[in-house]
Amino acid sequence: MEDPQSKEPAGEAVALALLESPRPEGGEEPPRPSPEETQQCKFDGQETKGSKFITSSASDFSDPVYKEIAITNGCINRMSKEELRAKLSEFKLETRGVKDVLKKRLKNYYKKQKLMLKESNFADSYYDYICIIDFEATCEEGNPPEFVHEIIEFPVVLLNTHTLEIEDTFQQYVRPEINTQLSDFCISLTGITQDQVDRADTFPQVLKKVIDWMKLKELGTKYKYSLLTDGSWDMSKFLNIQCQLSRLKYPPFAKKWINIRKSYGNFYKVPRSQTKLTIMLEKLGMDYDGRPHCGLDDSKNIARIAVRMLQDGCELRINEKMHAGQLMSVSSSLPIEGTPPPQMPHFRK
């Protein structure tokens, strides 16, 4: 997901390129320079310890912007963690996170600075809002395969992508209609009590409240938006099953969403095993805030990850969808699209 390279006379200070940005996503790392190809790498005229960069031939890349970006990336790749933090601090950027995250953050800072001179970043501003949803559902210890999960908490966190602030939240508990008694395991895991679900509305009633709330926010009409989840299960399993149980058609506005685990793994180049909520927070230098497995608290923490990723230059975009009742991936090569205005789905006949 990134790269390119520059044509500067050997021996001259091409470090000015480092003030501009890093390589675009999708390229390759520049090769390590040989002694005769290298010189000290500089940021704002200051040398980095032992960091070097290479000059490149004019035929390597057609656009000099990307040549400069590639040279910058090579320098950043060879910086120590302390150097990375110092440079990030200098630009008043977040300094928490593991080394790979710090490198990605600094590269994207330089990349954005340079590319802003060429063109506006369409994807960054495409969605005005992101709705983070993390359902809680009935469960039993060991999750036996025959157990039917019913949604018992419906939270939504409204993230403004321009201010990077949580603008509002929605939370409603839901009364289950098949397994009406919560298991001790479920109560302990989620913190949701039997009394809370007994006094709650049924799923169709809660879904109607969610949709009315989203309409008040003018999502899909005045503002472009997308849903975002931590994994595929919230939409492809929990919402899908719940709609069947409640005899509702699957709501069109929930057919496509951003799976932040996929976005995180692709952006920071980490394996799937490193994309659990607590691990993502840890790698970004953050602690979980709130009660784990509280749907609203989980959603707020997912929003914190989304904010950090946007700050680091990630283009959060729809990457999963439901089609004919099946989970499918959405290619990043397709045009970016928004989510339709929320509408209450019809009941099945």
From Swiss-Prot:
Gene3D superfamilies: Ribonuclease H-like superfamily/Ribonuclease H (3.30.420.10), SAP domain (1.10.720.30). The modification Phosphoserine is found at residues 59, 62. Changing residue 99 to A: Reduces slightly RNA-binding to the stem-loop structure. Its main location: cytoplasm. Its EC number is 3.1.13.1. It is found in: Cytoplasm; Nucleus; Nucleus, Nucleolus. AMP binds at residues 136-137, 293. It catalyses: Exonucleolytic cleavage in the 3'- to 5'-direction to yield nucleoside 5'-phosphates. Changing residue 111 to A: Reduces RNA-binding to the stem-loop structure but not 3'-end histone mRNA exonuclease activity. One of its GO terms (biological process) is rRNA 3'-end processing. Mg(2+) 1 binds at residues 134, 136, 298. Its cofactor is Mg(2+). The active site is at 136 (proton acceptor), 293 (proton acceptor). Changing residue 134 to G: In SEMDGC; likely pathogenic; loss-of-function variant unable to rescue defective maturation of 5.8S rRNA in ERI1-deficient cells. One of its GO terms (cellular component) is nucleolus. Residues 76-110 form the SAP domain. Keywords: Cytoplasm, Disease variant, Dwarfism, Exonuclease, Hydrolase, Intellectual disability, Magnesium, Metal-binding, Nuclease, Nucleus, Phosphoprotein, RNA-binding, RNA-mediated gene silencing, rRNA processing. Although it can bind simultaneously with SLBP to the 3'-end of histone mRNA, the presence of SLBP prevents the exonuclease activity. The keyword Hydrolase applies. Residues 1-48 are annotated as: Disordered. Residues 130-306 form the Exonuclease domain. It is linked to Hoxha-Aliu syndrome: An autosomal recessive disorder characterized by mild intellectual disability, eyelid ptosis, and limb anomalies including brachydactyly, clinodactyly, dysplastic or absent nails, brachytelephalangy, short metacarpals, and toe syndactyly. Spondyloepimetaphyseal dysplasia, Guo-Campeau type: An autosomal recessive, severe bone disease characterized by short stature, scoliosis, platyspondyly, irregular vertebral plates, facial dysmorphism, and variable anomalies of the pelvis, hips, and extremities including short, rudimentary, or absent digits. Identified in a histone pre-mRNA complex, at least composed of ERI1, LSM11, SLBP, SNRPB, SYNCRIP and YBX1. Interacts in a cooperative manner with SLBP to the mature 3'-end of histone mRNAs. Binds to 40S and 60S ribosomal subunits and to 80S assembled ribosomes. Found in a ternary complex with SLBP and the stem-loop structure of the 3'-end of histone mRNAs. RNA exonuclease that binds to the 3'-end of histone mRNAs and degrades them, suggesting that it plays an essential role in histone mRNA decay after replication. A 2' and 3'-hydroxyl groups at the last nucleotide of the histone 3'-end is required for efficient 3'-end histone mRNA exonuclease activity and degradation of RNA substrates. Also able to degrade the 3'-overhangs of short interfering RNAs (siRNAs) in vitro, suggesting a possible role as regulator of RNA interference (RNAi). Required for binding the 5'-ACCCA-3' sequence present in stem-loop structure. Able to bind other mRNAs. The SAP domain is necessary for binding to the stem-loop structure of histone mRNAs and to form the ternary complex with SLBP, but not for 3'-end histone mRNA exonuclease activity. This is 3'-5' exoribonuclease 1. The lineage of its organism: Eukaryota, Metazoa, Chordata, Craniata, Vertebrata.
